[in-house]
Amino acid sequence: VDTLTTSRNALDFAERFRKEGVSNLSLVFRGWQSGGISKADYDTLKVGSGIGKENGLSELKKSVEKDGRFYLATEVVTANDKQINLRSEAVTAITSKLAVINAQDNDVMFPETYFAKPNKVIDRITRLSKRFDSFNLSFVGLGAYLYSDYTRDASVSRLKFKKQVEKTVSAVKQGVAFGNINSYLWQYADEYFDIP
C-alpha cells in the first residue's frame, strides 16, 4: 500500500494554513488504518505504519486542536469484497441479492461496494469509539445511508437500524462528525461535512 499523505504531511499542511491566517480548521484524516482506504480489513483497529503510527496521529491532533478540530474518518457502512465476508457480513436486499453500489467507472480498483449488516455497523462504531477514545471520529457513510437487511431469519428494518444507530452514536463520548447527514443524526453531530 502506498501512503499518499502521512501524519507529518498533514501537520505541515495545517501549520502552513495557520501561518497564512487560516484557523479554526476541521481536519479529517482518512486512510489511517493499516491497509489504507481500500485495503483495510473492515474490522481492523490498527493504525497504518506508513502514515506515522498512532504517535504521529496524536501529534497531528494536538497541533490541529490548538484552534480547530481533528477527526479520524472511517467508513462504517460500506466495504468492498476484500474487506468483508459477503456471505455473512453483507446486507441482503429485498430481491434476495446482496445490496451493492456499482461504480460508474469500471477502471476503479473496486467497482462494487457492499453494505455491511446493521450489527456489523453498530459493533464497528462501538469498537472504534472505545479504542480511539481520545480522538474525534468521523463516520463516513453513516449519515448518508439508512437501509434494511432482508437476510432470511435475521431481517432488520430501517426503523430498527435507525434506532440502533441513534442509541450507539448517542453513547459515543468524543466528538462525532458525519458526511451527507440525514436529519435524524443532526442532534448527535459536532460537525457534518459534504452537504449537497
Predicted feature descriptions by range:
Residues 1-25:
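Carbohydrate-recognition beta-sandwich/jelly-roll modules
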Residues 24-196:
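Aromatic- and carboxylate-enriched substrate-binding clefts and catalytic-loop regions
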